[in-house]
């Protein structure tokens, strides 16, 4: 199984890339974590937010492997505990599908793209900056794997 994070935005600060790389390399090959950065639509194009999100949605869809289960990160998504995420990860592993986590741009994700997803989750009730979302998501996916494998990283 591959865990793919398709995130709108490029040119993250070095600390984001360092943290992402650290968690990604900790995961084993059978639960690989991969980042696919999606070019954001220019905010100076004169397009409406809906048009910009639709353009970004097309780029996201083009970056996803066929058959991957899509999970959108959204402020209105379902709250998951860390243990709940590990249980969900175990279920996805059992299905044998790649899982793609979709992270929108400044305006969020296109409504049609969200509707095509197998689920919506949120990392927090707080508003998080996009660089933090990448770090938190990668850490939580690693922690979920650690719970499943009884790795000492997670001590609850």
UniProtKB/Swiss-Prot annotation:
Which Gene Ontology terms cover its molecular function?
A: rRNA (pseudouridine-N3-)-methyltransferase activity
EC identifiers of the protein: 2.1.1.177
**Leader sequence segment:** none
Which pairs of Cys residues are joined through disulfide bonds in the record?
none
Report which reactions are catalysed by this protein: pseudouridine(1915) in 23S rRNA + S-adenosyl-L-methionine = N(3)-methylpseudouridine(1915) in 23S rRNA + S-adenosyl-L-homocysteine + H(+)
Q: Which family does it belong to?
A: Belongs to the RNA methyltransferase RlmH family.
Protein's UniProt name:
Ribosomal RNA large subunit methyltransferase H
Q: What organism, scientifically named, is this protein from? A: Bordetella avium (strain 197N)
The coding gene here is rlmH
